[in-house]
Amino acid sequence: MSHAEKPMSDSVNHHHHRTFEVLTAEPVRSRRKPRHWSDEEKAQLVAEALSPGANVSAIARSQGLDPSQLYAWRRKALSSGMVAPLTEGAPAPVKFTRFEAVGSSMVEIVVGDIVVRAGADVDPDHLAKILRVVR
């Protein structure tokens, strides 16, 4: 029998004690319950994220939100056609709101430096919520 195959005896164990300490770990930050964001809160954050020069990640983190979530909300808003980003060359915010028909099936509403585009068949209550947030 080689040394590795020899059965361990009390005399061998007596000279080679090993001590193991079991550590338990807890997360540094406990997981919070997911927050429910209202449509108005989402619209406000998306509007801020669409501002020229906006730092989307910083905006998200300032609200305790994962940046990927705000990017997803922004992407959804843009793909829906309900909002559009303004470019850096956009004029300074104006003090009035403009409402225009863009063809027969689309309306465009400008509130300050935010442009809201919606289909003519948009739910008025949903549009009102969006407009309250971007005012």
Curated annotation (Swiss-Prot):
Keyword set includes Transcription: no
InterPro entries: Transposase_8, Trp_repressor/repl_initiator, WH-like_DNA-bd_sf
Gene Ontology molecular-function annotations: sequence-specific DNA binding; transposase activity
Record key words, sorted: Plasmid
GO biological process: DNA transposition
Region Disordered, residue ranges: 1-36
Family under the similarity heading: Belongs to the transposase 8 family.
Protein name in UniProt: Uncharacterized protein y4rG
